[in-house]
Each structure stands twice: as structure tokens, then as C-alpha cells.
Regions:
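Internal acidic/polar
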Residues: 2-7, 85, 91-115, 120
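Short, small-hydrophobic-rich alpha-helical interface motif
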Residues: 12, 32, 36, 47-58, ...
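Arg/Lys-rich amphipathic alpha helix in sigma70-family domain 2
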Residues: 60-67, 77-97, 163
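Short, charged helix-capping/linker segments at alpha-helix termini
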Residues: 13-23, 34-53, 176-178
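N-terminal module of bacterial RNA polymerase sigma factors
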Residues: 1-26, 30-31, 170, 177
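DNA-recognition helix of helix-turn-helix
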Residues: 84, 129, 138, 144, ...
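Short helix-capping/turn signature of helix-turn-helix
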Residues: 27-30, 38-40, 134-141, 151
Length: 178
């Protein structure tokens, strides 16, 4: 029987079980790294560094996890904070690397041309809309969970997702075959 995230967190808290935390990392590292790659506009090295920071912070601060939300929501919040702190330091000067976009493998988008256009369109969205769209549409968080991760009101998340999706549709339609 596979342990739940809550069971693993309990083992970390009670027994300081590093193997349990390792299992939490294994379960969530792909999603966290994927989110950070999108937020950093496909800068793989930076995203991986930020993911490592996020997991380290999660381990150091796991006693602050209150269980009010899923562990993954709490972890996404930490990862997003790492991104925001880094973006503030860099003033978000990260550009688009075309080769990395082409190597990006999104299982939902099999057409390389469409994947490229989608990545390009996502990178053109304002950060608040891009973050909400990525969390809700790509990472499968509910609007409520995304609001917790982004630390913004639920209505703002819904608005950002709606606006972001509408902008993506318009951009992709404009770039499509005529």
C-alpha cells in the first residue's frame, strides 16, 4: 500500500525520516520543475536551481506545514516564492531560448509547431496571468489552490486564468494558418 503525502509528512515530522521526504521529492519534483521552467521562460538550469532551493526550504520548514491544503499546494507556494525572489533580483530579464522551447516535451501537445507557438504565447502573457494559467491549466490545481500558492484572492485567480486563456486563444488563432 502506497503512503499518502500526509503519511509521509507525518513520518518526516515524527521520526525525521529523510527517506519519507525523499519520496515526497520524487513524487513532486517533475511538477515543481515543470512549473518553474514555465515561469522562468524555459531556463532549465535556473528552474532546476530554484526547484532545489524550494525542496531545501520545504525540508527546513516542514514543521510549518499545517495541513490546511495539500502538500503539493504548499510546495508550489514555496517554489513560486523562490521564483519571485529570484525574479526580483534579476528584474525578470530572462528571455526566450528557442532551442530549449523546441526540446520542451509537453505530453499534452504533440505537434512541435503548436508546442513552440504555445510556449511563445505563454511567455508573452503578463506574469500574473501566466502563473495562474500554468498552475490551473497545466499543473491541475483548483482555482482555490492556485489562490493559496499565489497568495491572491480567488476572484483574481479566476480573472487571471480567464484573461490568460482568452489571450492565448487569440494569439494562437492569429499565428495559425490563414
Amino acid at each position: 500500500m502506497e503512503l499518502t503525502d500526509a503519511d509521509l509528512v507525518a513520518r518526516v515530522l515524527v521520526d525525521d525520516d529523510q527517506h519519507a521526504f525523499g519520496e515526497l521529492v520524487r513524487r513532486h519534483q517533475s511538477a515543481v520543475r515543470g512549473l518553474l521552467r514555465q515561469l522562468t521562460r524555459t531556463d532549465v538550469a535556473l528552474a532546476d536551481d530554484l526547484a532545489q532551493q524550494a525542496f531545501l526550504r520545504a525540508y527546513k520548514n516542514i514543521r510549518n506545514f499545517r495541513g490546511e491544503a495539500r502538500f503539493s499546494t504548499w510546495l508550489y507556494r514555496i517554489a513560486y516564492n523562490c521564483f519571485r525572489e529570484d525574479a526580483r533580483r534579476r528584474k525578470e530579464l530572462v528571455g526566450i531560448d528557442e532551442e530549449q522551447i523546441q526540446r520542451q516535451q509537453d505530453p499534452q501537445v504533440t505537434d512541435p509547431g503548436l508546442r513552440h507557438d504555445l510556449m511563445r504565447a505563454l511567455n508573452l502573457l503578463p506574469l500574473n496571468e501566466r502563473s495562474a494559467v500554468l498552475l490551473c491549466c497545466q499543473n491541475g490545481l483548483s482555482h482555490d489552490e492556485a489562490a493559496r500558492v499565489l497568495d491572491i484572492p480567488l476572484g483574481t485567480v479566476k480573472t487571471n486564468v480567464l484573461r490568460g486563456r482568452e489571450k492565448l486563444k487569440r494569439m494562437l488563432a492569429d499565428w495559425g494558418p490563414n
